[in-house]
Amino acid sequence: FLLKVAYNGWIKDHCVTLEQFTSLVYDLTGVTVENQLKMPGGMDAVLFLAEPDHLFDPKLWSAVKVSGKNDGASEFTIDADYFAQNALTNCELINLEDMLQNGTIMNGVMIEKPHRFITACTIATQIILAVTSSTYGGATVSLAHLAPFVRSSYEKYYKKYKENGLSKEQCEKFAKEDTKKEVADGVQTFNYQVNSMTNTNGQAPFLSVCMYLGETDEYKEELAMIIEEFLNQRILGFKNEKGVYITPAFPKLLYVLEEDNIHENSKYWYLTELAAKCTAKRMVPDYISEKIMKQMKVDANGDGQCYPCMGCRSFLTPYIDPVTKKPKYYGRFNQGVVTINLVDVALSSGKDLKKFWKIYDERLELCHKALQVRHERLAKATSDIAPILWQHGAFARLPKGASIH
């Protein structure tokens, strides 16, 4: 059905037979269907799939023109054409810790736990590419999930020098030097990969990187090393085609202000100074106050929580995993966004405040219905539609064919 809709909407105009088009869509994963049903054919599919009659109303689509009408009432964000693919979620916090520590599967190949920092960086970027190719929003990863592999690298170097008969002091000195060099190489690899690879959305992954010392106690020193290197490399910038250093678009940086780094006499004050220097030159990182966030994000246990925003800059709501009874943020996502055009509501009210709120309530209800349609579409999917998300750790580890609802 979807293939015929897409074919009738656009493919036919390009002199491709239905049989030829169907033969292209041999793999019914979300990624493959996504690329075959993108605008404008996917738009026709959306109108067939948005079953409730009120969602056929062109007022719902301010971002796209339906029936030649676009009055800007509300917006089915980000792209309505993605709605035709029922398993595509929007933004997420990738559970990089689980995927690196317990392994994952990509393209049918088992990727086991890495044993060096630079290897972990390479695998992380491949995970980011796979995940962002199976979604349509922004993603965030935490550098705390990479920190344990810095220690793994240090231990390997230390063991090498010890086996060569060096003293403890020499082993520590040379192992630290080698580890620092590997951290620099790993961060450079990460940055180059993120900026040079293209996902199935036809763009570099819309990625944010979280720098939160409070996420780990055991590997805080290693995390500080990674944060320092990320900031130094961002200050330097990337060379463009003319060899001039410029500000790279991605990854975005998220720096958390906490007791360990906000006072001049605190241990990690030097990182905050470096972050400020980076902001002055490159307009990143963005800053999150641990103190204020813990006041605003209180979970069901009564505990304040601090965690990064998703790539889209929106924050998940506090949540307690019913199985572990612990807060859960990584491996969560949002299902999609619908936006009210407040300017249009104001203009439509004719300066009548009561009419403004009446129109506002109507538009808000329409947005809620649109969100419910997104939820219902997603709830029908199985884990097979995006294995990297649902089967191999980015969101969950469900069996094949299991419902994601």
Pin down the residues of each PLM region.
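A domain-level signal for the structural core that forms small-molecule/cofactor-binding pockets
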Residues: 4
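Conserved catalytic cores of very large enzyme subunits
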Residues: 7-405
